[in-house]
Amino acid sequence: MIYAQPLCYPRLSRLTHSYEALERRRRTFHCRNTCLFKNTLTVGTTISIKLICGLHYATQHTGSFTRHLLHCTSFAFAKLNVARCNYYTVHPSSPFLNFTFSLDFTHRTYKVTFINIEINYR
């Protein structure tokens, strides 16, 4: 397994403002990002993605936000074969990885503050 560090534009750590613009009581977040890889990926590459979500959750009594880390390891696109998925386009002339994911929280009110993406491929 080789670890690939993607070049993401804009940097995912700077997407805080766009997520904060969402309503605080919204329970499902749909996010889309495009990453450009330094290493060229070939069609048929198996890619696994792990999301680490930085969240703040609001208490119902005070409304204040407390730091909370949640590891999101189970979501729709955990492992996909590039050759069999239309959501992915990987070839030398356009080495982009496009993906969409959603987070669903049912117990508390959350605000997404940052998202880090680790991508491993072989």
Swiss-Prot record:
GO BP field = regulation of cell size
Q: Extra notes?
A: Partially overlaps SPT4.
Name of the protein: Putative uncharacterized protein YGR064W
